[in-house]
Curated annotation (Swiss-Prot):
The keyword Cytoplasm applies. Belongs to the CoaE family. GO terms for molecular function: ATP binding; dephospho-CoA kinase activity. This is Dephospho-CoA kinase. The gene is coaE. The lineage of its organism: Bacteria, Bacillati, Actinomycetota, Actinomycetes, Mycobacteriales. It comes from Corynebacterium jeikeium (strain K411). Residues 3-194 form the DPCK domain. It catalyses: 3'-dephospho-CoA + ATP = ADP + CoA + H(+). Keywords: ATP-binding, Coenzyme A biosynthesis, Cytoplasm, Kinase, Nucleotide-binding, Transferase.
Amino acid sequence: MITIGLTGGIGSGKSTVSSRLAELGAFIVDADLVAREIVEPGQPALAELADAFDGVLNPDGTLNRGELARQAFATPEATEKLNAITHPRIRARTEELFKQGRESGAQVLVYDMPLLIENGEVDKVDHVLVVDAPDELRIDRLVQHRGLDENDARRRIAAQIDRATRLNAADTVLDNSGTVEQLLEQVDGFWGGL
């Protein structure tokens, strides 16, 4: 089994690439999905986040993701606080999913991890696949498709490693500055070369 580390900045198109790789037969371990699972009601991380950040619980006890994001990405210190609470739990759950992937019989496991490089998890994978798009295009996508305001989009991008560092860590780069169809053609070409 080959393990692919799929990464890229917010708004780069990782989800599109991950979906296509799943269609092609890869076993996907999605760190963002794991991150959502670990903050569901009743999970210890949710209580810790509520203690660390003011007003991040909805009246029904679920996480107010928008408010958490607003606070957590406001300063590097706040981002570090968020990461200290969530990342150890994400790592533990992803290890469970890696085991499931190995046992599934799939030939390719894709670790869809936005912070693969920042978190020093490159050594977990055999090949680093980076989805890349210029920052301004990513900002436009975040504003138009995810409903973020421009300043929030810029803050989130600034909280991640710079594009050059990400590209330098890549074994393969998929250029998502064009159409979705062009991106999917690149994914299919990558898959065919495995």
